[in-house]
């Protein structure tokens, strides 16, 4: 008896036999995934409006390269017109390859500016030896970029923080500051003058790393502090990596939970009126007992014992 082998479906997409073709297909699939996630974040949070001038903060790292690449691709088919300008802050770090970004951006035909500000000397002078420079460096960098945005008609400032950054920041705030807070995908700066967006808010860092490697971006390492990482953030990062390895999908669930907050199931009295619960009839709030009276009563009870 002869076996009858099933014929392949005529519309099926045959798997490429050439490893290079397979790699190209995987890269194409990854690029489409990132485009979809970035587009979803832009839509969900209203990140881009018609006529926006978006300053893409380009550090030379994998995240900011990927963000610029995604925005350029989406710009060609976006439902609203907007312009991009790539801005890099030259902090005058020793041996910084100042030619890399201009050459890359010139080849792309992307409008760009290099803002020169010697924050390296300031940070090196102020921060004690052996201490992390990240916090001060970040504040100085943010101030310089905000100043550029103010004087160049920028309407949105795009930063390259991704999903893992947002989740890590949530745990940093939880563990070290006793508050439930992360990085908002879209926010107004503390001075009220700027709107900041994070188009990579839905994108995993591992996917960004794979995409950056596939695209062969000319990565510039941060040598200001030897690429040192804040120890606390490093510990949180290891925790998230362990979870991803042991319980795949857990970090994704945490990221999704940040968009599903139930104030009535927490304990923040500024977000939910707990005093109104159980109030009889239409009794006005001023008839409710003064919360301080309960403390007084408690103290009196202890004094009588």
Swiss-Prot record:
Q: Which InterPro entries match?
A: Rossmann-like_a/b/a_fold, TilS/TtcA_N, tRNA_Cyd_32_2_STrfase, tRNA_thiolation_TtcA_Ctu1
Q: Give the Enzyme Commission number.
A: 2.8.1.-
Where can this protein be found?
Cytoplasm
Location of the motif PP-loop motif = 59-64
Q: Which residues bind [4Fe-4S] cluster?
A: 134, 137, 225
A single MF term (Gene Ontology)? sulfurtransferase activity
What binding details are noted for the cofactor? Binds 1 [4Fe-4S] cluster per subunit. The cluster is chelated by three Cys residues, the fourth Fe has a free coordination site that may bind a sulfur atom transferred from the persulfide of IscS.
Kindly list the GO CC terms recorded for this protein.
Answer: cytoplasm
Signal peptide range: none
Into which EC class is this enzyme placed? transferase
| Pathway this chain belongs to | tRNA modification
Biased composition (Low complexity) is annotated at: 282-293
Region (Disordered) spans which residues?
Answer: 1-20, 282-305
Q: What is its main location?
A: cytoplasm
GO BP annotations listed: tRNA thio-modification
Q: Which cofactor does it need?
A: Mg(2+); [4Fe-4S] cluster
What exactly does this protein do?
Catalyzes the ATP-dependent 2-thiolation of cytidine in position 32 of tRNA, to form 2-thiocytidine (s(2)C32). The sulfur atoms are provided by the cysteine/cysteine desulfurase (IscS) system.
One further remark on this entry is:
The thiolation reaction likely consists of two steps: a first activation step by ATP to form an adenylated intermediate of the target base of tRNA, and a second nucleophilic substitution step of the sulfur (S) atom supplied by the hydrosulfide attached to the Fe-S cluster.
Q: Which family does the UniProt entry place this protein in?
A: Belongs to the TtcA family.
> Could you give the subunit structure recorded for this chain?
Homodimer.
What is the name attached to this protein's record?
tRNA-cytidine(32) 2-sulfurtransferase
Species, as recorded: Xanthomonas oryzae pv. oryzae (strain KACC10331 / KXO85)
